[in-house]
Amino acid sequence: STTKAGGPSYLLGLGEVVPTADRNHEDAYQGHHDLAATLDARVSALYDAVRTHLDRRDMTELRRALVADAEAWEAQYGTGRDVTGLAWERNLLRYRPTPVVVRAAGGTHPADLVRVVAAGVRAGAFVSLSVADRLPTELAGALAAAGVDVDVEAPGVWSARLADLASSKALGLRVRVLGPREETAVS
């Protein structure tokens, strides 16, 4: 973790994120029908490109997640704020975009892929995506339009590239690995 010990986001790195109990997905975010007005245009295009490949539940969950991420961006992550409140100096807390390589292993759910990539795109980070399987044409086009570099790489090729990245000691580069839900689920 790169958070400052005792800092505002420190505890986030010490825990884990788990899904909440099943909710009524039909009623999720009924007030957000116009995603184009709520989401960054690039994120909205990613959602539009993938939603036809999702069932109703996954489509609703992804929509809910993208709206929640947009609200969190606007309220906390997308703006600098002085959390100290000192009158004689400014101590701005800012979240800065960091380059990220996202690896979607074979069987990665498309909603999971879009959620992670959309967060990076919204944050203004340089996002590079490595996928084991070819993406649907609409999604590949939306990713390209959002400025995401996409490479289709076999597992061995990805492993070699990851080893090269690790040995290069590229400062500030993050790697996010996604896989099939049944392999990554927390029990």
Language model features: what each stretch is:
Residues S1-S187:
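C-terminal segments
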